[in-house]
Design a protein with these regions (language model features):
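Short linear sequence motif anchored by a di-proline
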Residues: 1-189
């Protein structure tokens, strides 16, 4: 499904025509990817790099931001972005590596890998951004992700899009009611 078509036709969002080419592909940390954000009084898709520069070591970007950090009393590097610069990462699915491993014939070990997706054409994941970069927002796992990982992306349903981008998002932290399709990938050979 085309991202722009889904946003403008299915969700009826007043999206300005993106000035970027939107390719449907896998995205990985340290790569550019389109994110949906509200800037200059316009809802727009823009390319940003996945990973905030670390204040400790700029060569080691930070790819995930725990939602709980926003509610802690001590200041964090994420505070301004959580308050004013929220975005949505648009994907067909996301994946996680499990703690469990398997061994192939040559003795090499691999972690089991799982794919997760919502029943919507596009899986929307909460993000925060700064000038050139974005970070994925994570929360406690739900029943589908808990057996595989101790965190999960903060999934946003289409009906919650405006709340994440513009309003108080406290009610979005608990994702236990979100249902995800889970698919274990075949083992390497």
């Amino acid at each position: 499904m085309q991202i722009k078509k889904y946003l403008t036709e299915d969700l009826n969002l007043p999206l300005i025509d993106p000035q970027i080419e939107i390719k449907q592909r896998d995205i990985f940390p340290n790569q550019a990817a389109p994110v949906l954000l509200y800037h200059d009084d316009k809802l727009q898709l823009v390319n940003k790099n996945w990973g905030y520069p670390s204040p400790v070591d700029p060569k080691k970007p930070m790819f995930n931001a725990r939602i709980e950090r926003f509610y802690e009393n001590k200041p964090s590097m994420w505070d301004h972005s959580f308050a004013k610069q929220r975005c949505l990462i648009l994907s067909s699915e996301f994946f996680e590596y499990a703690k469990t491993t398997y061994q192939v014939a040559n003795g090499k070990k691999y972690h089991d890998r799982y794919r997760f997706k919502t029943n919507n054409p596009i899986t929307m994941i909460a993000g925060i951004y700064d000038q050139n970069d974005f970070s994925m927002v994570t929360t406690a796992p739900n029943k589908d992700t808990a057996p595989i990982h101790n965190r999960m992306p903060l999934i946003i349903e289409p009906s919650e899009l405006r709340r994440w981008l513009f309003q108080n998002f406290t009610s979005l932290i608990d994702r236990s009611a979100i249902n995800l399709e889970v698919q274990k990938e075949p083992h390497q050979k």
